[in-house]
């Protein structure tokens, strides 16, 4: 989440100081934030699949993720601990050819998601390991301070991008996946569907 943390810090300082940023910087932050969301979800899901002994699914998610890390490295100079947002904007603009390169990577990400879902959506062994296991109710999730996909997996329809929109998120058409019973299955599938929305 380095990119999201970097953007969150810059936005907080900008809000405190009353600094506005150019639209170009806003859209760069949205794009990079959504990429960070995809990478984070792939890490969570990939680690879960490794723990379950499902290495094929791990590679379907991790191989495209590596290409996004390479994109971030080329753009920011670092794969993981990138710091690219600056108070008042960004360090620099995207490089030439970034758009077609990134669209190619995103097609691979989507294929990895689809291939993984094909393997697990109706797989009885997988479903036995994740459905109705470690249920967390909406009330408990709120009481424990859950946020993000774990909160939404417990049935709480709350996402800052929709509920307190910033950076023009109110002008984007996207859905917020929400779970129904808060089990491992819901926590995993909320992440799958959020990646597709990103």
Label the model's feature ranges.
Residues 1-198:
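Active-site bordering "gate/hinge" segments
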């Amino acid at each position: 989440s380095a990119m999201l943390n970097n953007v969150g810090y810059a936005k907080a300082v900008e809000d405190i100081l009353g600094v506005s940023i150019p639209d170009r910087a806003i859209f760069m932050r949205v794009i990079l934030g959504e990429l960070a969301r995809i990478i984070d979800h792939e890490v969570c899901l990939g680690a879960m699949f490794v723990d379950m002994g499902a290495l094929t699914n791990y590679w379907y998610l991790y191989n495209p993720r590596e290409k996004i890390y390479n994109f971030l490295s080329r753009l920011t100079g670092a794969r993981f601990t990138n710091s690219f947002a600056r108070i008042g904007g960004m360090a620099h603009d995207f490089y030439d050819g970034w758009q077609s390169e990134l669209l190619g990577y995103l097609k691979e990400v989507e294929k990895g998601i689809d291939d993984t879902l094909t393997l697990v959506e109706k797989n009885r062994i997988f479903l036995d390991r994740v459905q109705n296991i470690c249920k967390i109710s909406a009330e408990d999730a709120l009481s424990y301070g859950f946020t993000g996909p774990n909160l939404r997996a417990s049935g709480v329809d709350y996402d800052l991008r929709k509920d307190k929109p910033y950076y023009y998120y109110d002008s984007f058409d996207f859905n917020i996946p929400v779970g129904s019973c808060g089990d491992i299955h819901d926590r995993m599938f909320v992440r799958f569907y959020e990646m597709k929305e990103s």
